[in-house]
């Protein structure tokens, strides 16, 4: 397969974000990503062979640390392994609210959501999970979300009267599961995996919605709590924990729709540029590992669409009203791209 040069990368196929979301979410999602082979009804209760895995990354990153020449060393897997096999959209702009939960919810609905980013509320508009489950009559175990923080616990389903909880996805909060599994004396060893978010609000949202608790998770995954905790100790970041959970889901249930939100690079809010770069590099590696897992699993290999996209960017170093890479508050071009 032809490898793209850096110049080729920047000249790859481009389209508007909302046009793209119109294809992969909303009323077209079930047909465009999960249409059954010819001769089978879309209303069939049997699982489709077509699958989709969506990886979004929050915290945002800028072109200068990624696709610009000086940043390309941070994303070798995206540039050399994934983009040559894919359609690459060079222009992705978020014109909505620059908060991680509300922005990710907007990706899941295809509509710019306007709720308070730190509120414990579901999206106002139907999500891709609800369209998928209702229109294709998919069971609950065929749509899952692996979310990075407690604030994402309501993302699996919307407030829509015609959709809602009956068609929502299962939501797993890996850090919350790990925290529940730990004793008060062992928590310090896992502190690096338990940071819920890097923009701590005054009031943390209540964990509600269609989320999975620790003992149900252990039962569903056929994985003991002790084994889960022991494996977590071998990991270096919360995103590695999320990808580990995603692998277990793929091997155990092979869901047709799996959504993973990564969040390590949002450590930029701490003001550490080196940790921000490390988060970008780790996200690049984990995206490649997800693709490799797809190729290894017979249920996924050859019939899976992998979609990788950011929620937004980060502030420019030149904007007097911002803090550069540290935040995403100005609404300037870099923070929205």
Question: In which residue ranges do the predicted regions lie?
Answer:
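Metal-dependent active-site segment of extracytoplasmic phospho-/sulfohydrolases and closely related
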Residues: 53-54, 282-326
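N-terminal export leaders
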Residues: 16-34
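N-terminal secretory signal peptides
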Residues: 1-16
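C-terminal segment of N-terminal export signals and the immediately downstream linker at the start
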Residues: 14, 34-59
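Substrate-binding rim/cap in mid-to-C-terminal beta-strand-loop elements of soluble/periplasmic
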Residues: 102-109, 323-337
């Amino acid at each position: 397969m032809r490898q793209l040069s850096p110049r080729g990368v920047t000249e790859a196929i481009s389209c508007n974000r909302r046009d793209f979301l119109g294809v992969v979410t909303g009323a077209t999602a079930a047909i465009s990503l999960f249409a059954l082979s010819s001769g089978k009804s879309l209303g069939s209760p049997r699982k489709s062979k077509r699958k989709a895995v969506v990886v979004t990354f929050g915290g945002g990153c800028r072109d200068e640390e990624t696709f610009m020449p000086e940043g390309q060393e941070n994303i070798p897997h995206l540039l050399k392994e994934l983009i040559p096999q894919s359609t690459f959209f060079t222009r992705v702009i978020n014109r909505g609210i620059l908060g991680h939960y509300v922005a990710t919810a907007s990706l899941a609905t295809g509509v710019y959501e306007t709720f308070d980013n730190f509120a414990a509320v579901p999206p106002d508009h139907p999500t891709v999970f609800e369209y998928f489950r209702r229109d294709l009559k998919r069971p609950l175990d065929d749509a899952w979300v692996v979310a990075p923080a407690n604030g994402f616990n309501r993302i699996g389903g919307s407030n829509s009267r015609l959709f809602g909880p009956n068609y929502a996805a299962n939501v797993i909060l890996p850090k919350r599961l790990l925290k529940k599994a730990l004793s008060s004396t062992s928590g310090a060893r896992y502190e690096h995996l338990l940071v819920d978010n890097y923009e701590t609000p005054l009031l943390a949202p209540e964990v509600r919605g269609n989320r999975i608790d620790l003992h149900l998770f252990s039962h569903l995954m056929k994985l003991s709590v002790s084994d889960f905790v022991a494996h977590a100790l071998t990991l270096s970041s919360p995103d590695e924990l999320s990808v580990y959970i995603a692998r277990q889901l793929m091997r155990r249930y092979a869901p047709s729709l799996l959504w993973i939100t990564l969040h390590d690079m949002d450590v930029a809010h701490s003001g550490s540029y080196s940790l921000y770069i490390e988060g970008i590099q780790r996200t690049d590696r984990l995206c490649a590992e997800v693709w490799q897992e797809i190729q290894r699993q017979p249920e996924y290999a050859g019939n899976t669409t992998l979609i990788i996209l950011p929620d937004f960017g980060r502030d420019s170093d030149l904007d007097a009203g911002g803090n550069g890479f540290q935040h995403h508050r100005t609404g300037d071009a870099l923070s929205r791209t």
